[in-house]
Each structure stands twice: as structure tokens, then as C-alpha cells.
Amino acid sequence: MNTTEKKELMGKYAKKLENTIKREAAVMKEIENDKALIKYLEGQKTSGAAFDNTVYESYDAWIETIRKQIKKSESTLTNIEFKKVELEAIQKYIA
């Protein structure tokens, strides 16, 4: 594989990285929404509101699931930051 072919291949990979990086705002919004939902559910639980949900067995179970989703999203943000650095390196290589 010659240098031109390598640069073409890395250019294609750079496009994939760019698409992944574009998700950053959506992931951040998802975290924000999840945190707001936790606050709401904790308020409902504290106020003694009846639990009416067929998916989760309790407010605590629902809140715990959302906390896990937040951790996953935070991990995704960390990966996106790494991909930004990786993309920058690739762009310098193919320039």
C-alpha cells in the first residue's frame, strides 16, 4: 500500500470519526434530560405519589436505570473526546 492509498483510507476513517463526533451535542442533551428526569422522579417519590409504571417495579429501580444510562453517556462523551484527538492527528497526516 503506497502513501496515497494510506491517506485515502485514513480519509475515509476520518469521515467516520466526524460522524461520531457530531453526536456529542445529542449525548450531552440526553444526559441533561436524564438528570432532569431523576430530579422529577425523586420529587414524585418524596411526595409519596403513587407509582404507576409497568416497566419498572419502583421509583428506585427506575432512577437506578437512569443513573446507569447517564454513566454510559458520560463514557460516550469521553470516547468522543478521544476521537477528536484522533481525528486531529489523522487530518495532520493526510494534509
What residue ranges belong to the model's regions?
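Generic detector of low-complexity/intrinsically disordered segments
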Residues: G11, N19, K39, G43, ...
